[in-house]
């Protein structure tokens, strides 16, 4: 879902990377890329240019793909898959290898959210880093878990109980010099300090 180019919101380029040996070789259908594209399209007002990649669990390939997407101007890069303790799970190592700064709070919050659902969340090793002017975040491998960690936990009436990690993404991207991301509150309300909130632009 991409809004019209006449939108009053800043355009953003987002890299989405699904990491799976079997999906990348056609053994089964990849569900990570569609889940990421669907959620982001519903969560953001901004016009989005997606840069999708489906790659195997190879550390060098993952690192090279992340660097490629950063160099291509992606302000945000989200990965899915390869963050567990299995021998082939190397996404965190590949991500840290290209980092200029680590952002440990994202991984900590994702594990706290997932622990509300499954005790095995403590086996997750997701990390987040900044490289140049890009924020790179590892997400879980399952579409349901992707949505839960991005959105957080809500009660039956839709009130936020535990913030999802995406609430902090727009302000982080502000701080590293990226576009001004604006979220749909019903999906995920972005948090910014009052002095960082931009007045609405007039529609073109």
Predicted stretch roles:
Residues 1-204:
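Non-catalytic beta/alpha edge segments that cap or flank active sites
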